[in-house]
Swiss-Prot record:
Belongs to the UPF0145 family. It comes from Hamiltonella defensa subsp. Acyrthosiphon pisum (strain 5AT). It comes from the Bacteria. PANTHER family: UPF0145 PROTEIN YBJQ (PTHR34068:SF1). This is UPF0145 protein HDEF_1024. SUPFAM superfamilies: YbjQ-like. HAMAP family: UPF0145 (MF_00338). The lineage of its organism: Bacteria, Pseudomonadati, Pseudomonadota, Gammaproteobacteria, Enterobacterales. InterPro entries: UPF0145_dom_sf (IPR035439), UPF0145_YbjQ-like (IPR002765).
Amino acid sequence: MKNTTTPTLQGYDIREYLGIVTGEAILGANIFKDLFAGIRDFVGGRSNAYEKELIKARKIAFNEMNSTAESLGANAVVGINIDYEVVGTSNSMLMVSIYGTAVKIFSL
């Protein structure tokens, strides 16, 4: 499955548009990891604990979107948009939403 944020893929012809596909992931951060992330992992303005959760959530959302695209008969998703949000009453969850257009492509 090819994925791109652009509306086309260089070297390929889009032969069929199959519809919008989405993928979402909401991950609750471990409360103890949250508590100590600022102390233990915060180096140079970055938190390894949060970055790992972000990568995990993004992979889940991409897998969900690609699985839906495959079920439609697509071999690529174009025009992908990725949104990140912190949600929950105490901002304790991370949400990643991904969407794009499932297409059938062929090499030129």
